[in-house]
Amino acid sequence: MVKIRPDEISSIIKQQIEQYQQEVKAVNVGTVFQVGDGIARIYGLDKVMAGELVEFEDGTVGIALNLEAKNVGAVLMGEGTRVQEGSSVRATGKIAQIPVGDGYLGRVVNSLARPIDGKGEIATKENRLIESPAPGIISRRSVHEPLQTGIVAIDAMIPIGRGQRELIIGDRQTGKTAIAVDTILNQKGKDVVCVYVAIGQKASSIAQVVNTLQERGAMDYTIIVAATADSPATLQYLSPYTGAALAEYFMYTGRHTLVIYDDLTKQAQAYREMSLLLRRPPGREAYPGDVFYLHSRLLERAAKLNDKLGSGSMTALPVVETQEGDVSAYIPTNVISITDGQIFLSADIFNAGIRPAINVGISVSRVGSAAQPKAMKQVAGKLKLELAQFAELEAFSQFASDLDQATQNQLARGQRLRELLKQSQSSPLSLEDQVASIYAGTNGYLDVLPADRVRAFLVGLRQYLATNKAKYGEILRSTNALTDEAQTLLKEALKEYTEEFLASAK
């Protein structure tokens, strides 16, 4: 039997007393006195900061948004069904942040960057704040590199550059998401990381986008942030900032990124819902006074960084839905004034069978022309002019019965150019194919064809160039310009293929 020595016990107790350190930890705690509709009003929490995360007894997290004299209004980031009146809340001292890293590529995540695709956890090493300040003027460079969408009408007449913000605006069901998805598909092999943020959409629509991207091998360089229609308003409001934070990680490591916010109208509606429940005073269309700041602080994060910061870029394609083509509503006018141009999609053009249904007359790109490849500049100027003249003549010709030959020729050319701009969904075109199509249209090679055969001719021409004049494509890919040699090859191909096509049509 072991003998217990009293001196040993006393020395152990003495040692423990000497090593004891009293730590006083002050925790900022409050009490819920009202809860409902995803909003909690909290008494106490005197030292809470605006935008600080607060944690409820059941583990639900909220964001303190309203700091009033006697209480704090917090929005819940979750269902919050177990949050009750009288339960305690503590301030965490943190503001909303998410993990970021290369592990997110190919994954579908929610507004808090947690995976929802059933493929397991995502390994990350660093975190980023969901809301971080936009790069300053000194940190930026002017937009000078092209971002090709693969859509002829956009790349020729409304060009987009890396670091630009280009709005896609139009009524529902006019092909806004289709343009965004085609742009992602066209980034394959161009070392551009794409982030698609779905805000308030049906889960089935998001699944459709994921399937399209997977089938075409585009998920390898894409992250999808999904806040479905049944998500709480708080998560729909946060999702665009999460997408921007994920893209910023790549931008600040010198990579090029493309972020699509589909769509910001639903984010504004979610923010309006939160603000009205928080009893903030409503303004125009019942939106709160800071709804402009909601979008401006998001879109200003898109930038082309200077060489010192690694020359990375973030290009933003926000989508906004209009009602009956009303561009003068509150949210559309706000976002138009923030962005560097807009692509306007018209329901009338869509119903007339012209897809993509881009209204070239009122669509504009304010900075992208500086980034347009030289080859496209060489052929696009003439296309713009001829289409503008055609639109004017077409309106006039509806009232005139007999037209002279020159006018008839111009109308016929315009109809063929319009056919040239039609494009199937999920079939983006390379620069050399776009240049060949436009060159054929503006130089009269399509005038000899019936208008309904133009698209079939162009498909055949692209195949003919790839097999018989491969050097043409090589020159354009290496120089980005339509050199004399490339032009000669293109003319030869057009002459040879036109004869072949007309002979086969007989």
Curated annotation (Swiss-Prot):
A single Pfam family, by name? ATP-synt_ab_N
Q: What class of enzyme is it?
A: translocase
Q: Which InterPro entries match?
A: ATP_synth_asu-like_sf, ATP_synth_asu_C, ATP_synth_asu_C_sf, ATP_synth_F1_a_nt-bd_dom, ATP_synth_F1_asu, ATPase_a/bsu_AS, ATPase_F1/V1/A1_a/bsu_N, ATPase_F1/V1/A1_a/bsu_N_sf
Compartments (UniProt record): Plastid, Chloroplast thylakoid membrane
Q: What is its EC number?
A: 7.1.2.2
Q: What does the record give under GO molecular function?
A: ADP binding; ATP binding; proton-transporting ATP synthase activity, rotational mechanism
Q: Which UniProt keywords apply?
A: ATP synthesis, ATP-binding, CF(1), Chloroplast, Hydrogen ion transport, Ion transport, Membrane, Nucleotide-binding, Plastid, Thylakoid, Translocase, Transport
List the NCBIfam families hit by this protein, alphabetically: atpA, PRK13343.1
Family affiliation: Belongs to the ATPase alpha/beta chains family.
Q: What protein name does the entry list?
A: ATP synthase subunit alpha, chloroplastic
